[in-house]
Amino acid sequence: MRLPPNDCSLAGTVQQGRDMMFAQLAGVDMAEADFYWAMFHDAVLEGAILARCDLRGATFNSANLRRADLRGANCGLDNLGGSTDFIGADLSGADLRRANIAGADFTGAKLIGADLSDANAVSELPNWRLTWFRGADLTNARLAGARLSGATYDDRTVFPRGFNPNEAGMIRFIGR
């Protein structure tokens, strides 16, 4: 999907179940749109505005969401894993309950106050990419029941008060 020239908004639209595979939507304003069960496989959404979107059940395998604004988005039950790139994205206040985040890269992402309750960062597949939280800010994030075993973090990662990444089975990454 490509928008017509000079059209850079899907804000507030209803796109339920829409096939957005390979869509080129970098920088597009999609705030408060309804993408319930939409497919974003290999989509380019770099810098897109997806704040307060309904993304429940959507799939994002191998999508580029670098620096995307997903503040307050409802991503519950989503498949956000499979090498999806959230580097530098803002997911503050997002609902990621029961989302599959295995293989996603949250390096430098803001997950302040996000709800990752029962989210799954563990893949059952061999040779699967690790889930990265290097330099991510998880201040006040809810992690109850989240399966984070094998996910990586580093010294810059900020966790909620009282959360112990080692007890959750996370791996400390040393290096660049």
Give each language-model segment a name.
Residues 1-176:
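Tandem repeat scaffolds
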